[in-house]
Amino acid sequence: MLCQRLLRVFIFVIVAASLAAARDLAVVSNKSNAVGAITVGDLVKVCKAQTNRWPDGKLVTFVMRSPSSPEMKMVLEKVYGMSESELNSLIVTSNHARASHPAILVATSDEELVNKVASTPGAVGVVDVYSINSSVAVIKIGGKLPLEPGYLLHGN
């Protein structure tokens, strides 16, 4: 009886953890940015700080959650194609020459991420779709919006 109860609790915890990790994410932008859509290749360049300026001349800043956060697991796999430690090194290297306007900012919460994107001209970020508010604009990836079939950052 005790073994069955422990097994049920264990299965519940595993299922709950996998559902929590399968979040739908979205790319959001500062409203002053002229970018409404981005290709997957261009998104990778922005995330890796390989794109310094938008077509209108504004400096690009990418805002993200900590590479160790569960939210970033999918982004590490689908966008960066690198490990957490490699991404941490990339953040340090990318920001070294851009102290006044960092290439990559790390936020401690989705709320902080949205606020940083909203208040930083040229900023874009990746955030849980349920944290989006009217202070930021949603950017299409590969012609698709979040929750549309085939969207790159769909959680499942």
Q: Which role fits each region the language model picked out?
A:
Residues 12-13, 50:
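Short, charged beta->alpha transition segments
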Residues 1, 22-23:
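Absolute protein N-terminus
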Residues 14-15, 119:
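Residue-level detector of alpha-helix boundary/anchor positions
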Residues 15-22:
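Sec/Tat signal peptide C-region and signal peptidase I cleavage site
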Residues 1-10:
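Bacterial N-terminal signal peptides that target proteins for export
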Residues 23-156:
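Exported/periplasmic ABC-transporter solute-binding proteins
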